[in-house]
Design a protein with these regions (language model features):
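Bacterial N-terminal signal peptides that target proteins for export
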Residues: 1-6
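Bacterial N-terminal signal peptides
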Residues: 7-15
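Sec/Tat signal peptide C-region and signal peptidase I cleavage site
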Residues: 16-22
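N-terminal short leaders/motifs
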Residues: 22-33, 75-84, 91
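Short, non-transmembrane alpha-helical segments in secretory-pathway proteins
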Residues: 23-63, 103-121, 167-223
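Exposed beta-strand-loop-beta-strand "reactive/processing" segments of non-cytosolic proteins
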Residues: 47-89, 125-142, 240, 251
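A short, surface-exposed interaction/processing loop segment used at functional sites
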Residues: 83-129, 143-179, 254-286
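A eukaryote-biased signal for long
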Residues: 177-286
Length: 286
């Protein structure tokens, strides 16, 4: 399924990040080590990431002074995934690295192949609303960071959401992926069943427990109003990850499997499930 923004409207690329601080001579090493640790635990727990084994990583800074980095994962010259790492302030201590997003497949965020040409484009990361900001003479244009599609000129970005998440909702240093579950092994197109288009304002909210304990084969769709609801983007939910029993991530299909924090997904979107019936004996992993 190819997501189109028109469907619904309403090396280390710069060595290790060129933001290394003189007062933190070990920053590069800490960053590199942490990324490798996260990659290792993902590969060990989820076979969908097997191509990450013995993969090469390159990183680049996302925007000036944003404290966010895109990590490109390649193996044998092929793109096999990516991670987005943030840096969270810690009073009196070194800033803490946090895992904002990660994905597997040949398409990553802010791929040079899809970058706007012949114009200056600034990468802006904010989960599903990630985009290149292109300053044209007559207006500002937003270009989707995953597909390279330009949004209509009327679309404007809002305040970032993913940076408002508390660290407790994100994977942090030394934490491991402790549980993984595949809801659907086959790629699903949310447009095959469009019940999510109906008014669902009175439906019960689908919780993390509902998702994890789901025993039926019906699809789960996450709908996300983007850019002040000018765009409605539906995503098929494929997998679930749980880090150290507290940080939950939802894997959706978006030109590849893309994991974002569950807390972020709940802030920006709504889950739709045909049936979230679960066995009474089911339990969440520790």
């Amino acid at each position: 399924m190819t997501r189109s923004v028109c469907a619904l409207l309403c090396a280390l690329a710069v060595a290790w990040p060129a933001v290394t601080r003189a007062e933190e001579p070990d920053w590069d090493k800490r960053f590199h080590t942490q990324v490798q640790q996260w990659m290792k635990t993902i590969v060990e727990r989820d076979p969908q990431f097997r191509d990450w084994t013995n993969a090469r990583i390159d990183a680049q800074s996302l925007g000036a002074n944003q404290h966010q980095w895109l990590v490109s994962v390649t193996r044998d010259g092929r793109q096999v995934g990516y991670m987005v790492v943030g840096e969270s302030p810690a009073p009196g201590k070194q800033p803490t690295f946090v895992l904002l997003e990660y994905g597997v497949g040949e398409y990553i965020l802010f791929d040079d192949a899809f970058a706007p040409r012949a114009v200056a484009a600034e990468p802006v990361y904010d989960g599903f609303a990630s985009h290149w900001l292109v300053a044209r003479q007559e207006h500002r244009e937003l270009v989707d960071a995953k597909t390279g599609e330009a949004y209509p000129a009327s679309v404007a970005s809002g305040p970032p959401v993913i940076t408002t998440l508390p660290d407790s909702e994100l994977a942090r240093p030394e934490e491991r992926l402790t549980a993984a579950r595949v809801l659907s092994g086959a790629v699903q197109d949310p447009f095959d069943r469009i019940g999510w288009l109906n008014d669902t304002s009175h439906r019960r909210q689908v919780t993390w427990t509902d998702l994890w304990q789901k025993t039926t084969s019906g699809p789960v769709t996450l709908t996300v109003p983007l850019f002040q609801s000018d765009v409605l983007a539906p995503f098929a939910v494929q997998s679930l990850h749980l880090w150290n029993g507290h940080a939950a991530y939802v894997g959706v299909w978006d030109e590849g499997l893309r994991f974002v924090p569950y807390a972020y997904a709940m802030k920006v979107g709504q889950f739709h499930a045909d049936d979230t019936t679960s066995h009474k004996t089911s339990s969440l992993p520790d």
